[in-house]
Amino acid sequence: MKIQFLGAAGEVTGSRHSVEVMLPGGSRRFMVDCGMFQGGREASNKNLELFPFSPKDLSFVVLTHAHIDHSGLLPRLCAQGFSGPIYCTSATFELLKILLPDSAYLQRADVERAERKQKAGKWRGEMPVALYSREEVDLALSQF
């Protein structure tokens, strides 16, 4: 078994772990959590990085709980090709039906606010990028 820590190692947010299990005749890869990094520009840049594997190669995802730093990149993972099931408790799923759409809304609002400020000449620095759309949230939620 190989475990790759893709976040929450040396920091608090961004919990995502890739697990590869060697089986007779091949291997299987799955993820435990798929969380968003939180905490400023550096964290935002980490969220934009590609996964170090093809999401299409994942068999499934297991979520430990609903917090965004454990679930917030699921829509991005699904948009990049993951099509397997996502497993969690029913309570976690109920919370995700609120948290993930809200996350997409807040990201879009940040982009729109920055665009307005830029138009008015009041924006300095990098423009924020929405990690995913409401449609990508709906795609992820359909995989539970």
Where are these regions (language model features)?
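Pre-active-site segment of Zn-dependent metallo-hydrolases
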Residues: 9-11, 23-84, 88, 92-138
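In a subset of proteins, long, contiguous C-terminal domains/tails are tracked
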Residues: 1, 12-14
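Short beta-strand scaffold segments in enzyme catalytic cores
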Residues: 14-20
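Eukaryotic helix-linker segments that join adjacent hydrophobic helices
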Residues: 141-143
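Extreme N-terminal starter segment of soluble prokaryotic enzymes
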Residues: 1-4, 29
